[in-house]
């Protein structure tokens, strides 16, 4: 026995395919027309920033040259997606998933709607942060995949960079302020100038990671690159000067010390440096010897 033929009619509007289903009509023909949406959904944006609840524990720096984003700690990502680049053809989003450095973090996504409750054409401000996840020193990769109710999908990749390596103070250079005796002094000869002003130039550099990359030490704004010089008993007699930065990635800053005879013997100098994401160097302390050699 042969059944009668059934033909599926394409609905007038694309959204009817999802909301109302396919309509069947009896026909004498054996032909069947099946309608489906082959336009893939898209991840419209992935952005990153320091987590709001993280306070000052993570610092962000964006390099001007290549626009790479560097962090010293945890990162928060913001995701947006929509069902189709063509606003007239939507079957609705079925799922949004994400990985971080290859690890599925979909359960960490905040702000997702219940996709089975209604047809969702777009999602915005979907967030997750890296708390509890392993951060790579250097490149860290987020991949977001969106799938619609027609089974079409697309994936977008986004990279950020992490620098947790401390910079290093590489040099102390001592000079007298007087131009007629403007020779470079080693720290051991520092003691012969016990009644003059002394200029101390402290140099520091950021350390490369395994990828031969770093956030750098050239961005001189608050909470970024910095060099400071300290004296426990004579801090008020240290005047901080200007910075200089060279092509080798070395940042220098010159300080002037008021070396009166009485307080000079008490000078013990400590320098610290911060890179562009404010990793702090070890403290480097130099104490004036009892006598010049």
Across the structure, where does each feature detected by a protein language model lie?
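Low-complexity, disordered linker/stalk regions enriched in Pro/Thr/Ser/Gly
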Residues: 1-293
